[in-house]
Amino acid sequence: MRSSWMFVICFAMLILYTNGRILRPETSWEDELEDDLANNKRSLACSCEDGSGRTGTHWIFDCPKGWADCGGFRCCVETSK
């Protein structure tokens, strides 16, 4: 029985450390989720279908904050500041 608990603990530690990040207490789940979504940006260019002729970037999920959908399949452009 003791060896099975050690296996579970070692397996959990392996997952946490190979994942490359451990949640820090000072960060919230929303911040972590937002970072994860921002990291899911694809590096593929796309052409906006709104007639502007702009080139955007494909995103796996919806456009993040500071970006706008310009038509096409999840084609987003950075909004002007």
From Swiss-Prot:
Does the keyword section mention rRNA processing?
no
The lineage's top-level taxon is Eukaryota
Keyword annotations for this protein, in alphabetical order, are: Disulfide bond, Neurotoxin, Signal, Toxin
Example of a GO MF term: toxin activity
Disulfide pairs here are: C46-C75, C48-C70, C63-C76
Annotated signal peptide: 1-20
Q: What else is known?
A: Negative results: does not show activity on all ion channel tested at 10 uM (hNav1.1/SCN1A, rNav1.2/SCN2A, rNav1.3/SCN3A, rNav1.4/SCN4A, hNav1.5/SCN5A, mNav1.6/SCN8A, rNav1.8/SCN10A, BgNav1, Shaker IR, rKv1.1/KCNA1, rKv1.2/KCNA2, hKv1.3/KCNA3, rKv1.4/KCNA4, rKv1.5/KCNA5, rKv1.6/KCNA6, rKv2.1/KCNB1, hKv3.1/KCNC1, rKv4.3/KCND3, hKv7.2/KCNQ2, hKv7.3/KCNQ3, hKv10.1/KCNH1/EAG1, hKv11.1/KCNH2/ERG1).
Function noted in UniProt:
Has toxic effects on zebrafish larvae. It causes contractile paralysis and twitching of the tail within 30 minutes, followed by death within 40 minutes. Does not show any toxicity when injected into arthropods (cherry shrimps or grass shrimps).
Please give the name of this protein.
N.vectensis toxin 4
Where does this protein come from, organism-wise? Nematostella vectensis (Starlet sea anemone)
